[in-house]
Regions:
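N-terminal glycine-/charge-rich "phosphate-binding" loop or analogous flexible N-terminal tail
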Residues: 1-45
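Structural motif corresponding to alpha-helix initiation and N-cap regions
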Residues: 14-15, 32-39, 53-57, 78, ...
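Short beta->alpha connector loops at strand-helix junctions that form conserved
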Residues: 31, 72-73, 89-100
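Short acidic/histidine-rich motifs immediately flanking catalytic phosphotransfer sites
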Residues: 42-47, 64-67
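Rossmann-fold NAD(P) dinucleotide-binding segment
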Residues: 54-66, 80-81
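Rossmann-fold NAD(P)-binding glycine/threonine-rich loop
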Residues: 77-89
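Phosphate-binding beta-alpha-beta segment of Rossmann-like dinucleotide-binding domains, i.e.
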Residues: 87, 95-135
Length: 135
């Protein structure tokens, strides 16, 4: 199985192992891919994985061996899903990516707004607390 990752650097700058994918077949990883380079880089791909690299209908139709498209994101906005559907190519995403981190960030922002965390942080850094006669 030939697996092509078009923009591996966007999700793995080197701190994650690609070994699970490599166990499935021949994996070729490109850090980033320009639109004009997709057809050449993915010409033998049966599995194509992207994150930010756009896969247009023209691109999808130019890859005769393509059997599967995966996006390393929650959204499908970079893939022409209709073109893939017409070719019978499944397209999958990572729907639970960052769910916990998004929830944590949401609560952090709520605390920042309700407790004025940033205002107090700036006050401490300006020396307001250490210079206050009450502390």
């Amino acid at each position: 199985m030939n697996i092509c990752i078009l923009d591996g650097y966007t999700t793995n700058p080197g701190d994650v192992s690609w070994a699970p994918l490599e166990a499935l077949g021949n994996v070729t990883i490109y850090e980033l891919t320009k639109p004009e380079d997709i057809a050449e880089r993915a010409k033998d791909a049966e599995i194509l994985i992207t994150n930010k690299t756009v896969l247009s209908a023209e691109t999808i139709n130019a890859l005769p061996k393509l059997q599967y498209i995966g996006t390393l994101s929650t959204g499908f906005n970079v893939i022409d899903c209709e073109a893939a559907k017409q070719r019978g190519i499944p397209v999958c995403n990572v729907p639970t990516y960052c769910t916990t981190a998004v929830a944590q960030f949401t609560f952090a922002m709520l605390f920042n707004i309700t407790n004025k965390v940033e205002l107090h942080n700036q006050s401490v850094h300006k020396g307001d607390w250490v210079n206050s006669r009450h502390f």
